[in-house]
A protein has these predicted regions:
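Asp-based, Mg2+/Mn2+-dependent phosphohydrolase catalytic module
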Residues: 1-49, 58-82, 89-284
């Protein structure tokens, strides 16, 4: 089925009981709120619609992310923010990783999230015999030295027949830093590590467990909070927002305000249920 182009979210609003908004590229970018996006969010909430921010960002705790969104002018509550990092406690519980020394490639907030999950966080250069690696962000550590250290440590553990668990909270490869300005993020670091580990270890290379979009755990958390699956995913990236929703059995709307610029006749793969070139604010 070809994507349906709409001119306003009003056209399809009543088909859904809840809405999942990506953050960067949909509601905001590195310069602040995206014009129109925040107003659509506010209008939906005023009309009694359930809304959540569903973001791969894991450089902040949910509390910090909520405070940052509010400071930008977005009216949002803590229970409306689902970050990929906030999935760590459930994952550590399910996989029996509590009490494990955990190497963190991320921010101070990521260390805090690991502690809340029951892990014992450390840096890659701390000379700890860690058994868990979490790739969450690309800042606040020396990039190349850290990747070299993690590659070496994981290879040594696997070759010594010791368990090693790799977790990627944020599978995004790039992100919009500002209008027309892009940067690499955590998913790209994991790609480098995966390639290096596969080259050295072959079939014994441990895979990354991926928690954020387009993978199922973050959508499952949204469904758990909503209590149903009648949700519309609104995103700007085909490879994360749209693919993830499609795979999970949710409808998706691609908004052309972020990484994917929608042009007439453009073939979109994967294909969203709807497309919207830019945010338009209803008169009511």
């Amino acid at each position: 089925m070809a994507s349906q182009e709409i001119s306003s979210l009003d056209e399809i609003e009543n088909r859904y009981r809840g809405f999942l908004f990506d953050a960067y590229g949909v509601l905001l970018d590195g310069s602040g709120l995206i014009p129109g996006g925040a107003q659509v969010w506010h209008d939906l909430r005023k009309r009694g619609k359930s809304c959540w921010i569903l973001t791969n960002g894991s450089s902040r705790t949910p509390e910090q992310a909520t405070a940052a969104y509010r400071q930008m002018g977005l009216d949002v509550n803590l229970d409306e923010v689902i970050t990929s990092g906030s999935l760590l406690p459930r994952y550590f519980e399910e996989e029996g990783l509590k009490g494990q020394i955990t190497c963190v490639l991320g921010t101070a907030a990521t260390f805090e999230l690991v502690q809340k999950a029951g892990g014992i966080p450390c840096g890659a250069l701390d000379q700890q015999d860690y058994s868990v690696v979490i790739v969450a962000n690309q800042t606040e550590f020396p990039l190349l030295d850290t990747l070299d250290a993690v590659l070496t440590h994981v290879c040594r553990r696997v070759e010594a027949a010791k368990p090693c668990y790799l977790i990627l909270t944020n599978p995004d490869l790039i992100f919009p830093k500002a209008d027309g300005v892009y940067g690499f993020t955590a998913g790209s670091l994991a790609l480098l590590l995966e390639a290096g580990l596969k080259l050295r270890l072959g079939k014994d290379a441990p895979p990354f467990a991926k928690l954020g979009k387009p993978f199922a755990p973050i959508f499952a958390e949204a469904e758990r909070r909503a209590g149903h699956k009648n949700l519309l995913m609104i995103g700007d990236q085909l490879e994360t927002d749209i693919l993830g929703a499609n795979n999970y059995g949710m409808d998706a709307l691609l908004v052309g305000t972020g990484l994917t610029r929608i042009k007439p006749g453009m073939q979109l793969v994967p294909e969203p249920r709807y497309t919207l070139r830019e945010w338009r604010i209803s008169a009511c």
